[in-house]
Regions:
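Positively charged, low-complexity intrinsically disordered leader regions
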Residues: 1-36
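Substrate-binding N-lobe of the ribokinase-like
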Residues: 2-10, 40, 44-112
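Structural motif
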Residues: 20-22, 125, 155-158, 187, ...
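Short pre-catalytic strand/loop immediately N-terminal to key active-site residues, enriched for Gly-Thr
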Residues: 50-54, 264-275
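Short, small-residue alpha-helix embedded
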Residues: 66, 273-280
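Conserved phosphate-binding/catalytic loop of the ribokinase/pfkB sugar-kinase fold
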Residues: 100-108, 115-152
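Short acidic, glycine-rich surface-loop motifs adjacent to enzyme active sites
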Residues: 150-166
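Conserved phosphate/ATP/ADP-binding segment of small-molecule kinases
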Residues: 164-260
Length: 280
């Protein structure tokens, strides 16, 4: 796709697409401040917080990116019944994201990542999370929500897996098989080396390390050695297209019939890489 074609797709075609994002929803919180002294209580810096920012994270960030492009985005997952859930709801409302598939659970907390920033330096990250599969009473709720979306008409599904429990083997396979029956493409943002649960998906977007682990081979980050591992991973798990991110080398796509395409990267100075993989 040439630059002009890509621009036309982003401005005209994508705006009417209905995309469901299923996965691990998170809240990212940033505490920005200045560090000018060491605490008298312990040998640690004191951060004088000046500003707090909350943003959608994990699968929620994927939905936010889609909404920003003009898609009708639907989010499915599970959060706690807590104040951080309310922050997420407010941001979903503002972004125009449908969160009717976001289960509110009294048995877990909303996954939250708190980052402490001094000037432009991230000093510390605090994670608040309880990892666990969907509860027996939650799975039917997710299935019913997804079935209604299929009946209404979906253009695509994204499974955003952060290994927090929503994207279990059985649930991923049910989503993929149902989507295949409706001829709805499925894109996977994977976690870990066990890709069997993603079998039958249309696209998967690992980084180079994840792809090598899934294929059981380590290769240098160069075009020639990367392509065969692409092909092997794709065929091993029955995934139609593999799009691997390669840091400063850009991205490489390998699809059916040995189709391949490389997109180089543009170097930029980055202070916070969180959310970069979701954006891909």
């Amino acid at each position: 796709m040439q630059g002009s074609e890509c621009a036309k797709f982003l401005t005209e075609k994508i705006q009417n697409l209905k995309i469901a994002v299923i996965g691990d929803v998170m809240l990212d919180r940033y505490f920005y401040g200045d560090v000018k002294r060491i605490s008298p209580e312990a040998p640690v810096p004191v951060n004088h917080v000046k500003r707090i920012e909350s943003v959608l994270g994990g699968a929620a960030n994927v939905a936010a990116n889609l909404a920003h492009l003009g898609c009708q985005a639907y989010i499915g997952g599970v959060t706690g019944d807590d104040a951080n859930r309310k922050l997420l709801e407010d941001m979903f409302d503002k972004a125009g994201i449908d969160y009717s598939g976001l289960i509110k659970s009294s048995k877990r907390a909303t996954v939250t990542k708190m980052r402490i920033i001094g000037a432009t330096q991230q000093m510390l990250r605090l994670d608040f999370e309880e990892v666990g599969d969907l509860l027996p009473e939650e799975t039917p709720i997710m299935n019913e929500w997804l079935a209604n979306l299929f009946d209404q008409g979906l253009d695509g599904i994204i499974i955003s897996d952060y290994a927090k429990g929503v994207c279990s083997d059985d649930f991923c396979q049910k989503v993929i098989k149902t989507a295949n029956a409706y001829h709805v493409p499925v894109l996977i943002d994977p976690k870990g080396a066990q890709w069997e649960k993603y079998r039958g998906a249309d696209f998967i977007t690992p980084n180079l390390k994840e792809m090598c682990e899934a294929a059981g081979k380590a290769v240098a980050n160069e075009d020639k050695p990367v392509l065969p591992v692409h092909k092997e991973a794709r065929e091993l798990y029955g995934i139609r297209n593999v799009v691997v991110t390669r840091s400063e080398k850009g991205m490489t796509l390998v699809g059916e019939k040995d189709f391949s395409l490389h997109s180089p990267a543009t170097a930029q100075e980055v202070f916070d890489v969180s959310g970069a993989g979701d954006t891909v």
